Amino acid sequence: MTVTRKPARKAAGSRTARGGAVSAETKASSRKKGGDDSEGGGTSGRGGTLIVVESPTKARTLTRILGPDYRVKASVGHLKDLPASRIGVDVDRDYELEFEVSEGKKKVLDEIRQAARGAREIYLASDPDREGEAIAYHIASELSSLKKPIRRVLVHELTPRGIAQALEHPGEIDLHKVDAQKARRALDRIVGYSLSPLLWERVRRGLSAGRVQSVAVRLVCDRENEINAFVPVEYWTILQTFHPTESGRETDAFEAKLDRIAGEKAEIGSQQEAQAVLERLSGETFLIGSVSADEKKRQPSPPLTTSRLQQEGARRFRFPAKKTMQVAQKLYEGVEIPGQGLTGLITYMRTDSVRLAPEAQEMARDYIRRNYPQGLPSKSPSYRNKKGIQDAHEAIRPTDVNRTPESLASVLDRDLLRVYQLIWQSFVESQMLPARYLQTTVIVEGDQADSFRATGRRMLDPGFLAVRGARGKGAARSAKSEEEEEGTDEEEAELPLLHEGESVVALGPPDASQHFTQPPPRYNEASLIRELEEKGIGRPSTYATIMTTILDREYVEKRENRFYPTELGQTVNRLLVDSFPDLLNVAFTARMEEELDAVEEGDKVYREAVDDFYRPFSAELGRAKGGGMTNLKAKSEPTDIPCPVCGTLMVKKWGRHGAYLACGNYPTCKTTRNIVQTESGPAPEVLPEAPGEVCQTCGKPMIVRKGRFGTFLACSDYPACKTTRPWPPKGPASPPVPLPADLPPCPACGGAMVVKSGRFGSFLSCANYPACKTTRPLPTGIRCTRPGCDGEIVPRRGKRGIFYGCSRYPECDRTYPGRPVARPCPSCGHAFLMEKKVGGKLRLVCPEKDCGYEAPEGEDPGTPP
């Protein structure tokens, strides 16, 4: 295994080759269809070249291009990971990581090892990022005992040219990049395995915290707090439509906004003030005070980075970041093109650089020269990367600009085509001239020193906007920020030809409109990713995971494509901010990302980077465990909500399923209610009655409630009556089994038996639960038909679920697979019928095998005909 530590990373093309370089001519000569392999790789004899990639799709694409002289195997992601059962980071031994072969990956590793034994040389072509470098390192460590040449190749585009370039410039595994990945893994594991148990103990089981995800949740919570604290301010605007006096054309009318009142900036704060201004303007005469025109330019955006791709996917298509990356991954790894096979359509999609390779720029210029000659600049535009950017890869671009979105419309599905068009268009536009337009500003002055302002623009040259098919003033919309635009195409109208000193006439009365200042908008995926990027939190490759995690953990929820913190998210955020100020500090988290970058650059060693984080975190963790973090499980918050049963004010408590309301008169009154979020804040859940459903035990109405296993029916007289049953019922509604008036009491304590509902249906339980945990099957009221047996048919549970059998088991072993229904068989006279699925529908059948009776289709199993 060949590895190296370099003072700084070099571009992939400039890495020093360590022998075994394969020429482009060799690749071209071997591009023919290979034999079968588990990943689509060739089956050439011993002494060939083995290439190991991450995904089977990528393996098949490489196989198609390279042919049978190369065997390609896929690792299917990471082969090694930290153990799930323990933290796996030894803080006393320089943070040594305990990697082990992941569950289910031993077979994959054995296949790779077997293929490597018969290979002359091995190329590790996992993705060109930190995760890919770690995968290559772990594979190399497992194959090192074979004493074969192992080289690292970086494939930035899955095309014949891109693969040939990678194989002609093999390098070594970059241990600095591996250490950076290890450091990130160590930090995330330390935080997750330290904080999650603490949250389980103080809040509820199943919660988690993360080094970056928790900061993302904090941003959402902080924004919600800003919105709640925001006090709107009223203001008014006045618009007036004018028309040149000497013009007779209706098209010469234009709209202007009141800009100044008596020479001072127009600030109108109430309806009374607005009315006074309208009265002031009513008799005023106006003329054109000034006309100014300036040429403006709208620059094209740089080529796409990972974060901008995710933002644009969210803004334009409402795609979650995860979906955008999944679609881009498919475009990179290869799509089936008729006559060409699997073809990589874009370059590697995880990058924070806006740089383009010279050959890519020339490819774009050639396309622009042929299709948009007026938009071709004299030289290729260059874009500056942000400070601290890792410039290892190009920006995201198409591998062949001549594969236009139109040419692939019949090949790609809708999502693939939309993302490809976004990438293709961004690439071409970035290499074109800016759009030029003439912006005109007109000041309309009144005879009382009041003035209106109007602006308009006229397209001079569409430049890069020509790619969108935009022409004229429609293409000249202002370059608003993405948050302001929200996907709209608003534009400023072109003004008529006006001259200074020309008199104008007001058409109709002015239009006064009331407005209120708005709070900052809630984050959507695009704006939250942009905020994380601007603050230096996380890296492009992690944003999609962050978005998914905070939603899956139920710390935030989406409403109308915006992030709202849940009550759980707000609660956990408050606890973490109070107990772990460094961990939840935005600047501290950004600084740790810079430290990981420094490890990758070779400017800092792994141990120091992890130690810089662990020392302050360990101190905060000790204080939190020692009582610094509030134990919500032991805390009750008073509310002003009365108990619906006894009227006592309820208190807010935390249980294993989250926050809930409990009667303050506990244990005398054991009433509880779930909490739901409303516009006015948390409120008790309103439990609807189930129409027509009555309790079998006491006759009171049944209501719908929620538990661990979903909704169920419970008696409205709870806790006096604890009867429950499943809801909604599975299959056709069956009436509840009437309980006999002489139902025997609990055989253990003498208490009453009540109907309850569990995972496997209804059953009888002692009303004194949990003091008495006696249970019995729910009686069906149907006697066993075996001669001489006085048992009753009752539900029982086996390996395959619920079945019905005699209550005298094991003396009587008679069983039935379906629920018995107290209706005699009209064919043979058997005492009851049985429910059975026939053709996917629930039907009534005779349980006697020799009878074969089936009730007519559509007949309700629970109702006699």
Residue map of PLM features:
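Intrinsically disordered, low-complexity regulatory segments
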Residues: 2-185, 194, 275, 384, ...
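Short, conserved phosphate-binding/catalytic loop or strand-edge motifs used
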Residues: 156-161, 307, 327-333, 340-350, ...
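Basic, low-complexity terminal or inter-domain segments flanking catalytic cores
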Residues: 2-42, 46-50, 60-63, 68, ...
